[in-house]
């Protein structure tokens, strides 16, 4: 947005390539997506590319996911149960009726209508707009439309509200998992997050070549309009003079003068002084107790059997709330975690699930507390966690052949090293409580010329949300210039 409007833009990135959390890890001879794996809200990217005089499809090849996600449970009373979710509501209702009965299918239809209503209320007033106060949000929605505002259900928890739609505990688990999309527990996250179901019904896409191609496309679009990118470039300090930004000092001592800086990192790095004492007032660091989920991940290359993998797969144990109590209260990892698997080469379930492969490239993920700055996991502990995760998958039918497996693990302390001052939190602040969405800072900081973007600021975590945050920062900068 800034480069296409004639501003001189330089992007300084401490990593060797663009993308941040949207990274790849080399395992053997393969590269595996190791960060966000779900591509939704395509309109956000279409709008960005359109405004820059280009088309998204000129830079990215996207395939509509035939199945949004495949879910399986190990619970003894439901051994071998499996449910696929599709973008079409009636197709899902039919699948849910077969899976859990007609009452649950009717509950699902009502749940979808509620999620769509919430999304329509908040899309343009909150998600795609500058951060409002609670009162400003009510103003945007309209005082004559307070009923719609009330139906966004910020005072209710997602877990409690799901109980009004679903009696089958497996469905409550499945839709409660949407809280983890913003790094939170369904027991404490607001029911407003029901809108995520509608986001997925609008479409999930698979990016040909892997999610890193999204970052590559954004770099190419920026360069097309004159933006310059410098990688392996560590900023030691954002320099301030007379209350406003004047530039940055790099790790090697080089000083670069800028009229403005957009900081696209976790706000805790500012608040803890990692970019210099003068900018600590720009944003308060997120307290450890308020951090979102971290994870232990394994990028795996191995032969699999026994389970028809789709691109997105979720394997559930039976006690979902125990998992979040362990992470958020006891600061540990349950022995029977929910396991997410992104099978990167399984793009079309109708074809791929029946193909015998020599090897699958997979991201395997379990939730963990964001304590990577105060504790670390030993190799023995990581191996035990891997075995626990593999047991859950095995009991759901998926066998990973250890004799063919190569893997690279990343625990919370690894994520903290990649994203300093986070403790390994992957989504900024946990979205717990009715006011959590207003606790994130907006595009402006407490320092003139310093703007904020990324998953720890408004409108929140996720690839499309982080993209929106960058556009809001550019918008605010231009507005501050009086344009």
Show which residues each predicted segment covers.
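Rossmann-like flavin
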Residues: 77-188
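C-terminal segments that line or cap access tunnels to active or ligand-binding sites in enzymes
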Residues: 303-416
């Amino acid at each position: 947005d800034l480069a296409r409007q004639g501003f001189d833009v330089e992007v300084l990135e401490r990593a060797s390539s663009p993308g941040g959390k949207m990274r790849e890890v080399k395992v053997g001879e393969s590269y595996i997506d190791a960060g966000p794996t779900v591509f939704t809200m395509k309109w956000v990217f279409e709008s960005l590319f359109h405004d820059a005089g280009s088309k998204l499809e000129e830079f990215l090849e996207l395939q509509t996911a035939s199945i949004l996600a495949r879910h399986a449970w190990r619970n003894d009373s439901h051994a071998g149960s499996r449910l696929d979710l599709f973008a079409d509501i009636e197709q899902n209702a039919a699948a849910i009726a077969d899976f859990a009965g007609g009452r649950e299918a009717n509950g699902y239809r009502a749940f979808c209508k509620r999620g769509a209503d919430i999304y329509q209320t908040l899309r343009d007033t909150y998600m795609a707009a500058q951060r409002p106060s609670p009162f400003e949000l009510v103003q945007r929605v309209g005082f004559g439309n307070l009923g719609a505002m009330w139906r966004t259900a910020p005072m209710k928890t997602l877990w409690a509200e799901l109980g009004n739609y679903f009696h089958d505990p497996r469905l409550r688990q499945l839709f409660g998992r949407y809280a983890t999309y913003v790094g939170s527990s369904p027991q404490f996250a607001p029911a407003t997050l029901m809108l995520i179901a509608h986001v997925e019904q609008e479409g999930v896409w698979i990016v040909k070549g892997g999610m890193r191609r999204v970052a590559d496309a954004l770099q190419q679009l920026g360069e097309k309009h004159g933006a310059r990118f410098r990688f392996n470039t560590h900023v030691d300090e954002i320099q301030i003079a007379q209350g406003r930004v004047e530039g940055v000092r790099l790790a090697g001592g080089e000083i670069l003068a800028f009229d403005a800086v957009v900081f696209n990192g976790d706000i805790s790095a500012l608040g803890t002084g990692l970019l210099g004492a003068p900018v600590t007032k720009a944003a308060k660091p997120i307290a450890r107790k308020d951090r979102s989920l971290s994870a232990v991940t394994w990028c795996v290359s191995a032969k699999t059997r026994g389970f028809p993998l789709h691109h997105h797969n979720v394997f559930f144990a039976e006690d979902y709330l125990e998992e979040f109590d362990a992470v958020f209260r006891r600061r540990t990892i349950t022995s029977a975690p929910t396991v997410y698997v992104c099978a990167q080469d399984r793009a079309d379930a109708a074809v791929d699930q029946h193909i015998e492969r020599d090897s699958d490239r997979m991201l395997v993920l379990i939730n963990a507390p964001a304590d990577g700055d105060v504790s670390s996991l030993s190799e023995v502990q990581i191996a035990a966690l891997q075995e626990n995760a593999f047991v859950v998958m095995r009991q759901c039918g998926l066998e990973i052949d250890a004799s063919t497996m190569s893997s690279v693990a990343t625990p919370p302390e690894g994520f903290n090293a990649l994203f300093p001052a986070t403790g390994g939190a992957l989504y900024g602040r946990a979205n717990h409580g009715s006011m959590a969405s207003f606790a994130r800072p907006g595009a402006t900081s407490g320092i003139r010329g310093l703007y904020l973007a990324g998953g720890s600021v408004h409108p929140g975590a996720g690839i499309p949300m982080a993209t929106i945050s960058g556009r809001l920062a550019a918008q605010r900068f231009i507005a501050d210039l009086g344009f």
